[in-house]
Amino acid sequence: MRKDSESPVISNHNKVGFIGLLITLGIVFGDIGTSPLYVMKAILHTGENINESTILGALSCIIWTLTLQTTIKYVCVALRADNNGEGGILALYALLRRLKSKWIYILAIIGASTLLADGIITPAITVTTAIEGLESISPNLPVIPITLGIITIIFFVQRFGTESIGKSFGVFMLIWFLLLGMAGTVSITSYPLILKAFNPYYAAMLLARSPEWFLILGAVFLCTTGAEALYSDLGHCGRKNITISWAFVKTMLILNYLGQGAWVLNHVQTASAVNPFFAIMPQNMLFFAIIMATGAAIVASQALISGIFSILSEAMNLHFWPRMRIKHPTHVKGQLYIPMINLAMYIGVVLIILLFRDSSHMEAAYGLAITITMLMTTLLLGFYLHSKGVARVFTILFMGAYCTIEAIFLAANLSKFLAGGWCTMLIGGILFLIMYVWVRAIKIRRHYISTKPLDNYYQIISDIKADESIPKYASNLVYVNHASKEGTVDDKLLYSIINKQPKRADHYWLINMEFVDTPDTLEYGCETLIPDTLYSVTMHIGFRIEPRVSLYLRQVVEDLVADGKVDLRSAYPSLRKNGIFGDFRFIIIHRVYYPESSDNRQQNLLMSIYALISKIGIDEPKALGLDTSMVVVERVPLIINHRNNSIRRITHMMKI
């Protein structure tokens, strides 16, 4: 077996040290680090009376949500559930799919679709809230046009990659978190009793006595929405870097939340009219704070967009999403750019901004989808703990506790459904439909692929090669074999070689592609089936690796030639004497589903939707990274079953 890496340059941020911690701040904590911009403002807009017990209770909820949800669940537990160093809900699913559960993929696609839906609202709310801070300096400032301009720039620069500016994100976020902590600390000194919020008693009393507790919890939940992204970025920075950095980040966040609470209690009458985040900033630093907030929003948006590209790349290899064109704008491993997704996200974010107009209305749309993602992650983590032999009592307690907590948050966020939550749920529902249909359709297509034992056809393939009366089709003929059972081959592949148009070649290559549960695996094994004639190459590809069959096959061939296992010099004397290799041609067997071949209406509907969805992706030759000038696509029907309709023979023709 041979192994290769995806990129010539590998960026490794997993080493613990000052640089690693700095990079972690820039990559991982952008989302959760910008939550102080809008969390307290959202709490004040719930309609609850502003008094000491309310603010202390809300702050206590924030502190203990960050502790229970972010620290314990994600930092202490989830970060240990890594797939060869990779994290996130799809990496977790890849670990679990070997359990062969028929429905566990449903949890994964629900979680992934709601996570992606939440990603549409995050850039909109963070950038809008930051720009709204300028209204305190210039009330007539056109917030929406400025916000749209910044969003346009963010999405436009994706095509060029962010390798150069990405290195400065960590330094910027370090300054941002220090600003949060210092501003909060200064404000706390004006109302030291705010420190009582560390006592969970105040959170319990608020939830027990307030008739608006569900609205307050819906706002409080916004403080931890970035926790899922923290888990997804595990592969970029490593568990130790994230854990150490989180201790600093959490401290700065809590100081800022407490500082905002102190300011609110000192300005009860006017608190709901302004954003407490900007109010606690010294007047001579306000403009600097707005610039920093805008920059932090851009960093958060950039990290989120890159994360979505990575998630969808994983989804493609897990067969959850149609294959799309992926570009690598830099040599940094894992840095992707998916043009169609970038455009779709940009349109979505712009529509969100134009629809909701200000951050207060966006807060209603924010949080509901990610609550569902977190609930799905909890369920998958429970299965993971069980599969690792963790004590059943601990597994049940973990799942029970966090399912209860997240179900309460879900109920609280459902109260915002009509006010805006419907938007992210609609987006999430559409994404779920795409993923579900794609998974089911692929299973249907695989189910009806007919296979045959390959060794039964060794002799006829050898005879075709030796039969010079058959025109030579290519020196090297390559097929992608979709048969899953070892030693078998797709029957339409044999039909293509033998029956449809006998294809004589010097060498026949069968490519078997196996997408494995590990992220960065890229290996192959080669078996000679007929000496100097038929070869079977099995490629094991990790779920984060882009399948580039042409590139990988070239490396395989170079290895085999170097080892003397195959002679690929052209059979034509004029070319052979000059050591020129023979040509390669790829044959792709594309099965077309015809609804007329099935009586199953539900299946026909699903396959019709699948046909529509497939139009947003690229065709199989491009998906496999093949040179299209060397590819022939043969379309054949996907036979589901044969209807009983048959043509009746008559013995006497009617005269006309």
Language-model segments: which ranges?
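The structured alpha-helical core of multi-pass membrane proteins
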Residues: R2-I656
